[in-house]
Amino acid sequence: MGSIRNLLITGSNGFVGQSFLNYLEKLEERELPKKIILVNRSESKPISYKIRSRTEIISLTADLTKEWKFDTESSHILNLAGDGSKNAYTEEAAQNFIKICENLEIWALSHKPKVIVHASSGACFYGDSNNKNFINKSNLILSRIKGEKILARLNIELGTRVVTARLFTFIGPNILNKLHYAATIFIRDSMRSNLINVTGNPNTIRSYMHESTMSDWLANCLLNEKIEGIFSVGSSNPVTIRELAEFISLKTNAKIVFGNTKIEPSTYLPNNESNYKTLGLSEGPKWQDSVTECISIYSKRGMNLD
């Protein structure tokens, strides 16, 4: 990262942004970008002294769905702006995401960054419109696909290296603030009520890459010239919701109640074998170790997470 002159991060207040900043905090001073510009809709969350004492930090407030009027030189962009809440599947959130991508394209045409890493969704692999998982998430998926196409044009127009990072599911300390994800819900409920309520099909398949590994992969996307176009970020190690619930139950002694198994199960899993072989990337810690870490953290500060 030390070769990056100016790194612009949009949406740094979100889960991915906070995880990435935690990742930067662990780097040596020589490994940090020379300057980091943070752009958020609201005031940027506080930056640790370990980062701000070793590199220049600029924090800007802007509504990225409107014209980008901030004029700052940026050699590299990590675009994380988007609604990561439970409202992300609404039509309004979808249209706002497209506007952000359109505004980024316009801004990039005049500022000419060398590299853009754009956070999209792993759900974009749903291509069959008859698939219920596609239909239920169609607002999000179609907006992400359109955003990918908009920003891909910059490779042709400017020669900018554009990486579309399709993000899957993750685990780690920062995800504990997201109370609409299964892992967080299970951990919270097991600690508070000694009960894990599995409302969906327990055979649904997810994977759980640690947030620090996710951040390392995003850093590779920014730096490695071999990475271009669509790039899946996530673990290829399958974990059923049943396995997740049973492991958390084992660690917390919580009872499990399984709901409607007639709900169609879904598989949300990347195939990253080529990433390991050609790029030397690692999947990081075992998901069980990451979940255990989160249980430990929640037990210490869980009452303050809602």
PLM regions and their residue ranges:
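A conserved pocket-lining segment of Rossmann-fold NAD(P)-dependent short-chain dehydrogenase/reductase
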Residues: 162, 167-170, 185-209
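N-terminal Rossmann NAD(P)H-binding glycine-rich loop of SDR-like oxidoreductase domains
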Residues: 2-30
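C-terminal substrate-binding subdomain of Rossmann-fold SDR/epimerase-dehydratase oxidoreductases
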Residues: 194, 199-306
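Conserved beta-loop-beta element that borders a ligand/cofactor-binding pocket
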Residues: 121, 148-174
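SDR active-site strand-loop-helix element
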Residues: 10, 39, 77-81, 116-122, ...
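Short-chain dehydrogenase/reductase
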Residues: 94-95, 136-148, 176, 180-184, ...
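Conserved Rossmann-fold NAD(P)-dependent oxidoreductase catalytic core, especially the SDR/UDP-sugar
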Residues: 102-139
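NAD(P)H-binding glycine-rich loop region in Rossmannoid oxidoreductase-like domains
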Residues: 58-99, 128
